[in-house]
Amino acid sequence: MTPLSPQARATLLAELPGWTDVDNRDAIQKRFTFPDFNAAFAFMTRVAIQAEKADHHPEWFNVYNRVDITLSTHDANGLTQRDIDLAHFIERAAASLRVE
């Protein structure tokens, strides 16, 4: 797997509102805020199950109702289609839990 070209990256990120580039790294990130800890944990569980199936795992940080996620493909040393695919799944999971 190879990192996305700058043109492909820009095109694909345009479909993922709120996802931003990570400074000094070929990765993207987004913060999700939920009504409470239970909703945040339910979201993380859904993402974890999908990540395990895809054998592609996010970097994340959780405090109470907030989940910060960073995506990058370590084997490719950069952002790949796998990250974009996981970001789309994450968006659907967040929407199903009515993220704030």
UniProtKB/Swiss-Prot annotation:
A Pfam short name: Pterin_4a
Q: Which GO terms describe its molecular function?
A: 4-alpha-hydroxytetrahydrobiopterin dehydratase activity
What GO terms describe the biological role, i.e. biological process, of this protein? Answer: tetrahydrobiopterin biosynthetic process
**UniProt KW Lyase keyword:** yes
Query: Cross-referenced CDD domains, in alphabetical order?
Result: PCD_DCoH_subfamily_b
Catalysed reaction, written as an equation: (4aS,6R)-4a-hydroxy-L-erythro-5,6,7,8-tetrahydrobiopterin = (6R)-L-erythro-6,7-dihydrobiopterin + H2O
Q: Superkingdom, according to UniProt?
A: Bacteria
| InterPro entries (UniProt xref) | PCD_sf (IPR036428), Pterin_deHydtase (IPR001533)
Extract the signal peptide range: none
Give the enzyme's EC designation.
Answer: 4.2.1.96
Write the record's keywords in alphabetical order, separated by commas.
Lyase
PANTHER family of this UniProt entry?
PTERIN-4-ALPHA-CARBINOLAMINE DEHYDRATASE
Q: Which family does it belong to?
A: Belongs to the pterin-4-alpha-carbinolamine dehydratase family.
The protein's name:
Putative pterin-4-alpha-carbinolamine dehydratase 2
Traced from the root, the source organism's taxonomic lineage reads: Bacteria, Pseudomonadati, Pseudomonadota, Betaproteobacteria, Burkholderiales
